[in-house]
Amino acid sequence: MKKVIMLLLIFALFAYALSASDPNKCLKKGSKCVSVGKPCCKPATCNIYANRCIGW
């Protein structure tokens, strides 16, 4: 039973790592962001006037 739980935990962590590293999930700092349909990667935010992801 412990082995099954451990395998499920490892599978869940692996799936989370793959989903977190998806390059199409968010826009990098400096990317055009208005009317793209994707959010800027944290901690950047979309500046509507500059049409760019800006931030720290």
UniProtKB/Swiss-Prot annotation:
Keyword Transmembrane helix belongs to the record: no
SUPFAM superfamilies: omega toxin-like
Signal sequence region: 1-19
Tissue expression as described in the entry: Expressed by the venom secretory cell of the spine. The spine is a cuticular structure containing a single large nucleated venom-secreting cell at its base. It is an independent unit capable of producing, storing and injecting venom. On the back of D.vulnerans caterpillars, spines are grouped together by 50 to 100 to form scoli, of which there are eight in D.vulnerans.
Main location: secreted
Domain comment quoted from the record: The presence of a 'disulfide through disulfide knot' structurally defines this protein as a knottin.
Record's protein name: U-limacoditoxin(3)-Dv21
Provenance organism: Doratifera vulnerans
